A protein has these predicted regions:
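Residue-level structural signal for beta-strand termini and adjacent loop
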Residues: 37, 59-60, 118-121
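Vicinal oxygen chelate
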Residues: 14-17, 69, 73-114, 121-122
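Short, charged/polar surface micro-motifs in flexible loops or helix N-caps
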Residues: 50-54, 61, 80-84
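Core segments of cupin and vicinal oxygen chelate
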Residues: 11-53
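Conserved beta-strand in the GNAT
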Residues: 55-57, 115-116
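A short beta-turn/loop motif at secondary-structure boundaries
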Residues: 37-40, 64, 109
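N-terminal beta-strand motif that seeds the catalytic metal site of vicinal oxygen chelate
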Residues: 1-18, 71-74, 78, 123-134
Length: 134
């Protein structure tokens, strides 16, 4: 039996173009596809996450801000040098860094979704043993 891997993350927004532009221009995620409704209106833009796809989908719901840890957080793996550069790019785009840890910087995208830039040096645990507490 094969192990499951990330296929995609999906995020709803009332403004697909704006959110995709932020993730492409500020965080460097390349666009890989656009999908349209039968009437020709934009339904989604897909961005490359490297190990999967980030699907930015049209939603009729207005974004709701989650304070602290919430339902949505997109954390990107970066080098320490990239973290510093991305912090500058986020600030220039109006997405101020809300908090920092030794390894990770946290900000919000234009819809208020939490994003993180992390260079945690340890590999993520793998396999069934990783799920066991203690």
């Amino acid at each position: 039996m094969s192990e499951s891997r990330l296929h995609h993350l999906a995020c709803g927004t009332p403004d697909v173009e704006r959110l995709a532009r932020f993730y492409s221009s500020v965080l460097g995620l390349p666009e890989v596809a656009r999908h349209f409704e039968a009437d020709g209106s934009l339904r989604s833009i897909w961005l490359d996450l490297g190990a999967g796809i980030f699907m930015i989908e049209k939603s009729g719901l207005e974004p709701s801000l989650v304070s602290g840890v919430g339902f949505f957080l997109l954390a990107l793996r970066v080098s320490p040098e990239e973290r510093t550069a991305f912090e500058g790019r986020l600030g220039a785009a109006g997405a101020e860094i809300e908090s920092r840890s030794e390894w990770t910087s946290y900000a919000r995208d234009p819809d208020g979704n939490r994003i993180a830039l992390s260079h945690y040096p340890k590999a993520a645990p793998a396999g069934p043993a990783a799920a066991k507490p203690g």
